[in-house]
């Protein structure tokens, strides 16, 4: 385990901070948004339209985050300014989070929510890539797992404050309770997010980065590409600060080159990313639809939140257990166990008919949720070049952002065909099965020279 005060433990505190916002976004933000958007008042809309606009906002956020993540990561790797950019994304994200509680209209609420999520997601690119700087490869699994564990547990603290304001507010504050609960929820979460991150601001040092010699080789290779060379020259002619433009253009060019390298040479990384996309899509879809299952079982919103907190606590324990097991077993072995566990959870969904069964399913999800995410992060850290960790995690983040995309389409198709939500969730077993196969292929593939797993 991380020693208190060590840089590894300090790094893990950001999991505690950002997870608080994740939990708020999952449980309460949709409720607050609907309270502003739905109704017969001026500027308000129907519930269906509100849901559609919310989905559109999430789509915009996902696309923007996927585009800027790799670029920012590549720039940070080359300019050795990972901490500076990370700090900026956190401060802007926290500020937007707190401001979100004071928004008077649902339109402004959505705009600021999207802004918060974009900077939140950008911060995760840099945070995940810091793993290669704060620990050795033989401890990455443990450190990553402990980060997720404390994140699940620590996020409950500000969330319980927000939940208390939301539930108890009507009895104590009457008409203004919902507005005040929003202000309290966003403010407490934002302050928590920032305060627990301050030690990381102070202590983190970027150890791995692209050397000047490697940077020159990259530039030389880019100059051999006529399209990239001509595009950069043309833009530099019309820009008063060609250095900045050149940096951005080179970042895009490098990302293109890295993707090409992954597809043609670094196939271990490529196969893992395919596996990750499939099984993490299944994870995201199940999480998203647990609430729908609870609704079908006549579980009210408070009961659903209670089960959500229960899952968080179980996920904390599961991450700690798998973190300890990582000292004895290979990362891929533990990933196989987690994927198989989720496969079983999907099939178990077919038998759900009461709240006891729903609780068992929530327990199963919690056991493997954090562990699968943490071990995926640490395994990826081991098989990529550490000096390009920011850029690679930007690409990793694109695959993570796709979580629940394909699964949601499958869920919708099954429901439209007349199937139950139980059957729809059970179909997610296919994603875990195919993801398992691709992970096996990645595990057997020759490791790149930078891996030491």
Summary of predicted features, one role per range:
Residues 84-99, 333-348:
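Structural signature of the two symmetry-related core transmembrane helices
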Residues 2-10:
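Short, small-residue-biased leader/transition segments that mark boundaries at the very start
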